């Protein structure tokens, strides 16, 4: 009852569009007064969810936001394509809560970027409005297609750049960082 908003980040939701996975979770938790939305930003959906939660709280629109990241990409992996089976299933959650003005804990900063030009390197062709599921859909279009080497190279470069930018922006040295929980660079 004390959750104001549920954000679920996933590239493999329970259903394609309706109902949202967040609404299913809202019902199961019995928090009927909470807003609920799915957020899709591929592998970074959970991070975008945290940033969205932070901004809802900063705007005063919410005080307690449940952010969930969940993937079951094994269900859409082409197990015959060695470049595309480097995924694992899993889920994690965080409760983001408005803190007192005197507290210094929480989300300090974030740096969100995307690589739209790389869409061809990680794609599932069927299932969207551009190419709906149909009896004549080519079987390979039902599965995730990935250029593993390209995706890995991009992810490692992006992570290194992001750490550098965030450290510079916040006056933090690399030595002061205790933990980095990175994206799984496949």
Language model feature labels by segment:
Residues 1-4, 161-178:
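Phosphate/pyrophosphate-binding loops at sites that engage ATP/ADP/AMP, CoA/4′-phosphopantetheine
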Residues 9, 40, 65-71, 96, ...:
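Short beta-strand segments
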Residues 9-17, 177-186:
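Glycine-rich phosphate-binding loops at beta-strand->alpha-helix junctions
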Residues 11-65:
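Conserved catalytic cysteine-centered active-site region
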Residues 43, 71, 184:
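Catalytic nucleophile serine of serine hydrolases
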Residues 53, 58-82, 90-94:
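Phosphate-binding/catalytic loop of phosphoryl-transfer enzymes
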Residues 73, 80-153, 157, 161-164:
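Condensing-enzyme catalytic core mediating Claisen C-C bond formation in acyl metabolism
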